[in-house]
């Protein structure tokens, strides 16, 4: 998305007495991993006007000014009765303060945990708060009777869905959303951004799939014609398909053979941001993630999860030279459970010295735990490159666990089918991709021309590859085609295990393509590509891309071919 477009607010009727206010950012809003596709985002708020008026989910501070201007042109704030919260977030507090100045009569409607958060955020104010535990309703008049469904999760302990009986709209807050900005208010062209919906799920929902399943169960009895989501296009055309997809994706997470507990607490949100990036890497690596926010989890919940998983990571900030109480409690439970056959890891954000991380690592080491990663210390707020590094750390941790499991399985001889498939050959290439400051590359031989007009190709990429998260529709990459004779050095180099964040091209002479991706000076030829679409195929993604540019560098050379004897590995 272009950075040149200013932020704005779309206002549109979506049902009887109901409007959406979509605050739009065309560029990347924040550095959190869920925004990494750089499609922009929308923060959707809603207005229901019965005999009484309610707004749902006013946005964060960065949208506050333009949102309040649009809201005042939409409703008379002196007659605003309710502000309904799908979740509580500290970066919404300035918006709440501004609303209270403009409409001091408002009553906040929220879950019970959010009520406590509001009172803590406004200790000197006697706020009007109406907590919803799940059985209450709110009658706005003119048929708009609202039902409330608490949907807590480790990321959003105060989660709450709202259902309007008359319009049959379910206000889902974080569920079913996508971080994408455009002119389409509804999802009528949902096929064009379904990968954004999947990426959003992988980042935000996969680490607590069991809570997603619980939420789906709660809404299953409702007659719903529209999901009024918190981010992205409102869901109507793909409602049934997306609901089923959420169920399938959640089940797939739960059914994974290997699982990891991700225990964390966060002082300023930075350690939680790191945890989400690691969780995405773990998910890509093929393990189930059980995300546990230690500030809200009970000791029994922590212990039960620790007993069930194959490995765990503990994330902690350092506050006054120490770990916060919830982390000390969790660490005590880890040491009490005492199963040092489980793979361990430590991570966190710190401001000055990070003593908490050293303390946690030391106690785990003294207890005999093996570590699946070097303790990951991030100073202050992670940037885009750091988050990509954290994602790769998670993938490496997952692969280490999976290798440990495979050791116990005897190596099987290739079957006749695998031997036959192994005779399918492909040109040896190095695929490079770049997005912002993040750059990476991989060896690939599962490459094939796919179309004449436009010129296009397909490339198969394993799900756990670091480059995978840069290969979404709209992404750019370069395909470096290698020559017969000089390809073996590249194959040896790119087949090794790279450390997270390691420069893949440090030993080679390179230039930069017009699209910003790395070109190997010793390549036979290269083509610059734009990802058009991708298809999930078992343990790989098949990416179709159109060719934008290219150059033959060595006209007299012959393309290197990768000859194999089995189709069960590269």
Swiss-Prot record:
Alphabetically ordered keywords of this record: Electron transport, Oxidoreductase, Transport
A Pfam cross-reference name: ODP
Annotated segments matching region Flavodoxin-reductase-like: 421-570
Domain Flavodoxin-like residue range list: 260-402
UniProt entry tagged with the keyword Electron transport: yes
Region (Zinc metallo-hydrolase): 38-231
Cofactor, free-text remark: Binds 2 iron ions per subunit.
Broadest EC class assigned to this enzyme: oxidoreductase
Record-listed E.C. numbers: 1.-.-.-
Coiled coil: none
InterPro entries assigned: Flavin_Rdtase-like_dom, Flavodoxin/NO_synth, Flavodoxin_CS, Flavoprotein-like_sf, Metallo-B-lactamas, NADH_oxidoreductase_modular, ODP_dom, RibonucZ/Hydroxyglut_hydro
Function of the protein: Mediates electron transfer from NADH to oxygen, reducing it to water. This modular protein has 3 redox cofactors, in other organisms the same activity requires 2 or 3 proteins.
Database matches in PANTHER family: DIFLAVIN FLAVOPROTEIN A 2-RELATED (PTHR32145), DIFLAVIN FLAVOPROTEIN A 4-RELATED (PTHR32145:SF32)
Note from the entry: By homology with NorV in E.coli, may be involved in nitric oxide detoxification.
UniProt family annotation: In the N-terminal section; belongs to the zinc metallo-hydrolase group 3 family.
Name of protein: Putative diflavin flavoprotein A 5
The organism of origin for this protein: Nostoc sp. (strain PCC 7120 / SAG 25.82 / UTEX 2576)
